């Protein structure tokens, strides 16, 4: 383009010194048309040698996908469970809990309880992981995760580890009445759990999130079923299931939970907070 501009200038100068204005205008027009034609030829020539562009990898496309993209909850993909809130990209389901690592005796009793419930036509599904919740499940935006975790970590600096014991079976349901849970309620260690839940609540308030229940029933979640089966489970077989715990060969079974590290699960990430 620079070369063309120079050529046009030199011709324009020579025309202005020896030709009338009408002739100069005609020359300018012809030169302009010639330049346009030449430019078009170069563009065609250049485009004919272009290498086809490679498609963007899916991982790159995901980086720029709209964070508000609609998502359909397919309950059949996860045992009929429905989300308590709509899924949106950038929103992370989050809760705070103590993990429970079950011993062999616990699993033996649990299997007997599942068989007993099945006999009453109540198909319970064993929890994928056993834990004791210290918060409701809330939604965190991705950019809140680090400050949220740091707030909890700072609050727990001087909290001492302890243990708690769960023994009595109890039936629970979620707020939406879409799932029913069989849990083992804590009988020892409740004051420590209450204190911890209040600490977690302070962090929840910082981010305008829902705090824990006013009168919480701390428990280890054992199993669940779809729908509101609370009354049916209580009437049909709760006493029978409790009897299996009481009749354990080594005496009534008590689930002991060593509370030495609190955890926070947000999406697929788990953060650990060791207690002193």
Curated annotation (Swiss-Prot):
Q: What is its main location?
A: nucleus
Q: Which residues form the active site?
A: 131 (proton acceptor), 219 (proton donor)
Q: Which residues are involved in binding UMP?
A: 213, 217-221
Tell me the Pfam families matching this sequence: HVSL
Q: Which InterPro entries does this chain map to?
A: Usb1 (IPR027521)
Task: Describe the reaction catalysed, as an equation.
Answer: a 3'-end uridylyl-uridine-RNA = a 3'-end 2',3'-cyclophospho-uridine-RNA + uridine; a 3'-end uridylyl-adenosine-RNA = a 3'-end 2',3'-cyclophospho-uridine-RNA + adenosine
Q: What Gene Ontology cellular-component terms does the record carry?
A: nucleus
Region Disordered, as annotated, extends over: 1-58
Q: State the EC number(s).
A: 4.6.1.-
Q: Name one GO biological process term.
A: hemopoiesis
A GO molecular function term, named singly, is: lyase activity
Is Hydrolase one of the keywords UniProt gives this record? yes
> Where in the cell does this protein reside?
Nucleus
Instruction: Kindly list the positions annotated as binding AMP.
Output: 131-133, 213, 215-221
What top-level class of enzyme does the UniProt entry assign? lyase
Q: Which domain of life is it from?
A: Eukaryota
Q: Which UniProt keywords apply?
A: Hydrolase, Lyase, Nuclease, Nucleus, Phosphoprotein
Q: By its UniProt entry, which PANTHER family does this protein fall under?
A: U6 SNRNA PHOSPHODIESTERASE 1
Q: Which family does it belong to?
A: Belongs to the 2H phosphoesterase superfamily. USB1 family.
The family database entries (HAMAP family) matched by this protein are listed as: USB1 (MF_03040)
Function in brief: 3'-5' RNA exonuclease that trims the 3' end of oligo(U) and oligo(A) tracts of the pre-U6 small nuclear RNA (snRNA) molecule, leading to the formation of a mature U6 snRNA 3' end-terminated with a 2',3'-cyclic phosphate. Participates in the U6 snRNA 3' end processing that prevents U6 snRNA degradation. In addition also removes uridines from the 3' end of U6atac snRNA and possibly the vault RNA VTRNA1-1.
Its recorded name reads U6 snRNA phosphodiesterase 1
Q: Which organism is it from?
A: Danio rerio
């Amino acid at each position: 383009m620079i070369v063309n501009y120079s050529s046009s200038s030199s011709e324009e100068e020579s025309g202005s010194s020896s030709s009338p204005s009408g002739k100069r205008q005609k020359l300018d027009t012809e030169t302009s048309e010639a330049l346009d034609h030449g430019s078009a030829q170069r563009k065609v020539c250049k485009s004919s040698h272009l290498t086809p562009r490679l498609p963007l990898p899916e991982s790159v496309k995901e980086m720029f996908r709209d964070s508000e993209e609609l998502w359909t909850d397919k309950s059949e993909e996860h045992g009929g469970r429905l989300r308590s809130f709509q899924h949106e990209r950038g929103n992370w389901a989050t809760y705070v809990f103590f993990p429970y690592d079950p011993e062999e005796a616990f699993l033996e009793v649990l299997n007997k309880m599942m068989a007993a419930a099945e006999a009453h036509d109540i198909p319970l599904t064993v929890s994928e992981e056993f834990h004791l919740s210290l918060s409701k499940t809330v939604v965190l935006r991705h950019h809140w995760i680090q400050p949220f975790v740091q707030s909890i970590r700072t609050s727990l600096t001087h909290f001492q580890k302890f243990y708690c014991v769960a023994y009595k079976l109890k039936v629970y349901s979620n707020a939406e009445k879409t799932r029913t849970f069989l849990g083992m309620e804590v009988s020892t260690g409740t004051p420590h759990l209450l204190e911890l839940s209040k600490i977690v609540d302070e962090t929840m308030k910082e981010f305008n999130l829902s705090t824990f229940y006013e009168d919480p029933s701390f428990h280890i979640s054992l199993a669940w079923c779809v729908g509101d089966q609370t009354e049916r489970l209580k009437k049909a077989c709760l006493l029978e299931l409790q009897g299996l715990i009481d009749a354990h060969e080594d005496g009534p079974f008590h689930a002991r939970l060593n509370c030495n590290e609190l955890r926070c699960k947000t999406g697929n990430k788990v953060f650990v907070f060791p207690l002193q």
